[in-house]
Regions:
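N-terminal signal-anchor transmembrane alpha-helix
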Residues: 1-22
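Short juxtamembrane and helix-loop transition motifs at transmembrane-helix boundaries
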Residues: 1-3, 23-32, 50-61
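A loop-to-helix transmembrane entry motif
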Residues: 4-8, 29-41, 61-65
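Residues within membrane-spanning alpha-helices of integral membrane proteins
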Residues: 8, 15, 34, 38-41, ...
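Hydrophobic alpha-helical membrane segments
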Residues: 11, 63-80, 97-100
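Membrane-helix boundary connector in multi-pass membrane proteins
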Residues: 24-28, 58-59, 76-93
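Canonical alpha-helical transmembrane segments
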Residues: 43-55, 77
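Juxtamembrane boundary at the C-terminal end of a transmembrane helix
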Residues: 107-111
Length: 111
C-alpha cells in the first residue's frame, strides 16, 4: 500500500466519518468532541501551511493544501469554538465536506 492509498483511507475512514457524524448529530455530540474539532483545526492549519511551503519550494502543486488552510481548518476551529451554539449551516458544510472527502478519496483509492 503506497502513501497516497494510506492518505485516502485516512480521509475516508477518519475524517469523512468524523465530519459525517458531526454534521448529522449537530449539537447532540459530547462537549469533548467540540474541543477535539477546535484543536484538530489548529493542527490542520499549521500542518498544511508546512505542506504548502514544502511544495512551493520544489515547484509542485499545492492547491489542495490551500483548500485545507482556507476552508477546512477555519471551519473546524469555528465549530469547535462555538460548540453547541454553532449555527446549523456550519454543520451542513461539515456534512458536505464529509461526503466530499469520502467521494474524492474513494475515487482515487479505487482508480
Amino acid at each position: 500500500m503506497n502513501y497516497h492509498n494510506v492518505i485516502s483511507l485516512f480521509h475516508i475512514i477518519l475524517f469523512g466519518g468524523l465530519f459525517l457524524y458531526v454534521g448529522i448529530k449537530k449539537t447532540n455530540i459530547p462537549n469533548w468532541l467540540f474541543t477535539l474539532l477546535f484543536y484538530l483545526g489548529i493542527v490542520v492549519f499549521f500542518y498544511h501551511i508546512y505542506k504548502v511551503y514544502s511544495k512551493v519550494k520544489v515547484g509542485k502543486s499545492y492547491w489542495i493544501y490551500l483548500l485545507h488552510i482556507i476552508i477546512i481548518a477555519p471551519l473546524l476551529v469555528w465549530v469547535g469554538y462555538k460548540g453547541k451554539n454553532t449555527s446549523r449551516k456550519y454543520f451542513e458544510i461539515l456534512l458536505i465536506l464529509g461526503f466530499a472527502s469520502i467521494g474524492y478519496h474513494g475515487y482515487y483509492l479505487f482508480q
